[in-house]
């Protein structure tokens, strides 16, 4: 079954991009095409370039030797003996440069191994290498050479590089050693949690050294060395830049992360495991909910329980459900577990927090939402998880297992009366087992990988956050993971959402495809876009026959629910058409036009 809805909306912006959202989890496939021909062409060109570089280095070396030889003659040392001394002086500088490079490499190796003793030893050796080169340039022959303009530039370049390497040692490596000594990474994990003090020590270190690294790397790449040593510059800068390679990816989320963990003071967050098989506009039904608690400076992830045991049965009056929300989302807003019919996750999370506080008498500082797609992404880096019934979840199958396989294993046409509760327990177990494995096997070297899972989820609304404090919530918005409706006219988006209203598990079989046509510029400068949203039920006859009512719902496999389409901020919706003859109604929610 497939239903199409065609709408035209006008965007008051003269220009801007529009995006559609498909809020259901599934598999994503991509392919890469590699051209062997271009690879070989590039390789041949590179070899030719290297040949030219060798010739150029040889010319520079001859020129350098000639200049030094002339200087020796000028100070009374001539002939073959003078040339021999000149050659030795140049060779000494080159050898000292290679020693410097090796010592810097040892510093980086020590840091990578998180070995403060090895790093400090390498820093000491690096300082000696720098001092040796400076002593060489203090010789009379090099001081005389410094008076020659061209040679002066070369010597200045070498000294500039030495200063930058010295900065790398004193301003980057040694401060890192101090933190490694004061806050060894072995102290990061405390029983089943994480030390906030240790985390904050390394976050502060990264914030301190990152701009210094940027400065050093930029300055190094502008240094022009003599004697064919320019190739070393790239090696130096790459080694130093590698110190914060993961941080470069993480820094857009760093303000949010620091806000989330705070200074170690007590905090409580809800961790909602949403199930997209019962799809909702804000992700999925929150089948199980756990906690993230910070107590006495230690962050721990608590057990997960069924949403029915965790949230109050009725939405607290403090939520102040509006008449507009009742009109849009019906009676579903009366139960906090169903608040996610509202596509505005900020509102949904607030209601969940109130409902948790009412039932558990514990204040909530924020809410984090996870879906099966995020669990699958995490398993790629923490390894497989095996459930108590023997089901193995991997980075290849978790989404399908959690949204399809488990239901057809236990809730098929021959399901027992208690099978539903058993499956709910397996979902709660999945969330807890995944979080426990993340904690027990946590590897700081994989921070960049963990970030990728989080950032990818933030982009497609499979991970969302809400913070009670309004200032802290701004960090969530800036990181792009608030899950709120887009009210920014400078970044217009079309929102397409669906919520299943019948108790069933048919979300796996729902396909949503949104197409946005080319813009038509109107006389007043606004633009009109033709938007087509296609909703398809891809339930096969075989799956229908094998499924029990818990999966199929009250209508034998027919998907029923709420469709909401939001115009971009500042835009309108007109000329609504439906392929099945159904009626669509327009209205306004959070200042956005919707149907």
Protein language model regions, located:
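N-terminal targeting leaders characterized by basic, low-complexity, disordered sequences
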Residues: 1-50
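N-terminal type II signal-anchor transmembrane helix
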Residues: 47-112, 158, 172-175, 202-238, ...
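N-terminal, intrinsically disordered, polar/charged segments of Gram-positive cell-envelope systems
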Residues: 88-138, 163
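Long, charged all-alpha helical bundle/coiled-coil segments in cytosolic proteins
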Residues: 123, 128-195
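Solvent-exposed helix-coil-helix hairpins and adjacent flexible coil/strand "hinge" segments
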Residues: 162-569
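Beta-strand-rich interaction surfaces with strong enrichment in secreted/lumenal proteins
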Residues: 518, 586-591
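Short beta-strand and strand-turn-strand segments in soluble, beta-rich domains
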Residues: 579-585
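Conserved small/polar residues in nucleotide/adenosyl-binding loops
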Residues: 593-595
